[in-house]
Regions:
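Primarily the HKD phosphodiesterase
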Residues: 58-122
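Extracellular/periplasmic catalytic domains that process cell-envelope and extracellular macromolecules
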Residues: 38-40, 63, 90, 120-122, ...
Length: 198
C-alpha cells in the first residue's frame, strides 16, 4: 500500500510541475496526436431515424452541392441517395465514392449494393471499393469543400426505416471539410475502382 501511495505522489508531482521537460514532451505528443481542433463555424443541422428525416437530410446535402461530392460509405443501398448522386452528376457535380468492399461486394446477398454502385459507375461517377481495413466504417459526405455530413447513418434502406441512426451536417465549415477531405483522399488512394458486375 505504501509503495502505491509513493508512486501516486511521484506521478502527481511529475504532472504538477509546469517546468518538467518530460511533461512537456508528453503534452506535446498528446497535443500533436492525430486529432484536430478548430473554431466552431457554419451552421449545424441534425436528423435521426427511423423515419425522422435522416435520409432526407443526406439527400438535401447532395442536392445542395454545386461542384463536387466526396463520399465515404460502409453500407450503400439507399435508392434515394443513389438517385440524388445521379442527379448531382447530371448537373455537372463531380461525384466520388469510396465504399467498403466486403459489405457491398463480396458478401452473399449484396445484390442491392452492387446495383447501387453499378448505377453510379454507369452515370459516370468515380466509384471505388476499399478492403485494406477490417471494415471501412466511415459514413461521410464532403460537399463543395464547405459542408460535411456525418453520423451513424449508413446509406441504406435499413438505416432510414429500421435502425436508430443519426445524421449531423455542418454547413459552411471549410476548415472541417478540409480535414475530412484529407481523410477521404487517403482512403481513395487505398481503394480500387469498382468493377461492374453483370
Amino acid at each position: 500500500m505504501k509503495k502505491i501511495l509513493v508512486v501516486l505522489i511521484v506521478i502527481a508531482l511529475f504532472f504538477a510541475s509546469e517546468r518538467s521537460e518530460a511533461r512537456k514532451g508528453i503534452m506535446g505528443w498528446i497535443e500533436s496526436s492525430h486529432s484536430f481542433t478548430m473554431p466552431a463555424a457554419g451552421e449545424i443541422e441534425v436528423a435521426f431515424s427511423p423515419e425522422e428525416g435522416a435520409e432526407e437530410l443526406v439527400v438535401k446535402v447532395i442536392d445542395s452541392s454545386r461542384s463536387e461530392i466526396k463520399m465515404l460509405a460502409y453500407s450503400f443501398t439507399s435508392a434515394p441517395v443513389v438517385e440524388a448522386l445521379v442527379r448531382a452528376k447530371k448537373r455537372g457535380v463531380a461525384v466520388s465514392l469510396v465504399a467498403n468492399y466486403k459489405s457491398n461486394v463480396s458478401e452473399e446477398g449484396r445484390g442491392k449494393s452492387r446495383a447501387a454502385l453499378s448505377t453510379l459507375v454507369n452515370a459516370g461517377c468515380d466509384v471505388r471499393v476499399i478492403s485494406v481495413y477490417q471494415i471501412h466504417h466511415d459514413k461521410v459526405i464532403i460537399a463543395d469543400r464547405q459542408t460535411v455530413e456525418l453520423g451513424s447513418f449508413n446509406y441504406s434502406a435499413a438505416a432510414a426505416h429500421k435502425n436508430s441512426e443519426n445524421v449531423l451536417v455542418n454547413w459552411h465549415n471549410s476548415k472541417l471539410a478540409e480535414v475530412y477531405l484529407s481523410h477521404f483522399e487517403r482512403n481513395q488512394r487505398q481503394a480500387n475502382p469498382y468493377q461492374l458486375q453483370y
